[in-house]
Amino acid sequence: MAKTPKKDKTEEKEEHEESGGNKEDRERAYEVLATRVNPIASPLAARKLTKRLYKTVKKASKEKNIRKGIRDVQKFIKKGERGIVLIAGDTTPIEVYCHLPVVCEDAKIPYCYVPAKQDLGEAAGSKRPTCCVLLKPNESYQSSYDECLTDVTTLPRPI
């Protein structure tokens, strides 16, 4: 058996753009991802908010101004860092991150769930899925960060 040749990055981008298709396909893809989230994934960001959050995470990752992974996020929350915590809703088992919303509430840090850990990892600049990201404020993307912050804080909290 021979290995299959790797694709060029430009070919992958073209395929990704083609798979994005039209608006109806993207909405349907979000709806499918939203049905696959865990039962504790509340508050779940809406489609437009999710897209805006991913764009802000991409900007922050270029500035090296994010924390990825449960361990890092929890460590820096305990040290007093502020920001928005994004948690992937499709992470299994739930026990891996079920304590994180409580940690965020104790530190008075806003948090929300996004539907897919793969998309969150790609937005964070990683090839691997990421189940948690701490998004810190910065001057270069402050306006989009502020919009995301107001939207995340207005999401209804679970009981």
UniProtKB/Swiss-Prot annotation:
Gene3D superfamilies registered for this protein in UniProt: 3.30.1330.30
Q: What is this protein called?
A: H/ACA ribonucleoprotein complex subunit 2-like protein
Which keywords does this Swiss-Prot/TrEMBL entry list? Nucleus, Ribonucleoprotein, Ribosome biogenesis, RNA-binding, rRNA processing
Tell me which GO cellular component terms the UniProt record holds.
Answer: nucleolus; sno(s)RNA-containing ribonucleoprotein complex; telomerase holoenzyme complex
Q: Where is this region: Disordered?
A: 1-28
What does the record give as the function of this protein? Required for ribosome biogenesis. Part of a complex which catalyzes pseudouridylation of rRNA. This involves the isomerization of uridine such that the ribose is subsequently attached to C5, instead of the normal N1. Pseudouridine ('psi') residues may serve to stabilize the conformation of rRNAs.
Subcellular location(s) of the protein: Nucleus, Nucleolus
Q: Which Gene Ontology molecular function entries are recorded, alphabetically? A: RNA binding
Q: Which domain of life is it from?
A: Eukaryota
Per the record, the similarity remark reads: Belongs to the eukaryotic ribosomal protein eL8 family.
Q: Does the keyword RNA-binding apply?
A: yes
Any matching Pfam family: Ribosomal_L7Ae
Keyword 4Fe-4S, does the record have it? Answer: no
Record-linked PANTHER family: RIBOSOMAL PROTEIN L7AE FAMILY MEMBER
Q: Coiled-coil segments, which residues?
A: none
Annotated GO biological processes are: rRNA pseudouridine synthesis; telomere maintenance via telomerase
Q: How does it assemble?
A: Component of the small nucleolar ribonucleoprotein particle containing H/ACA-type snoRNAs (H/ACA snoRNPs). Component of the telomerase holoenzyme complex.
